[in-house]
């Protein structure tokens, strides 16, 4: 939590004021079942045309891709992420073929849609 009081300029739900980004993790492992449950919930997020342009790549600490994914992060993020039980990378498809379209075109909304999934 922030040491500085957070005060909204206008009336909003307290959950927005009290939100925080964790950067400290325990060494407790996360089970495959729990991790896949989180990813399943994300899979159901809304997207334009119900296209779900995102894909998740994940590695738990005890898996071969752990170091590979950790090394993709910038040094600052690597410093705190190395304590996490799992790393999840989110990628998104940048093109889209509308229903009935013969060719794909840029999916200008892919980052917005992908953001709704995490």
Predicted regions and their residues:
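N-terminal amphipathic, basic helical "cap/leader" segment at the start of enzyme domains
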Residues: 1-87, 97
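Small-aliphatic-rich amphipathic alpha-helix that forms the alpha element of a beta-alpha
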Residues: 19, 42-43, 88, 97-118
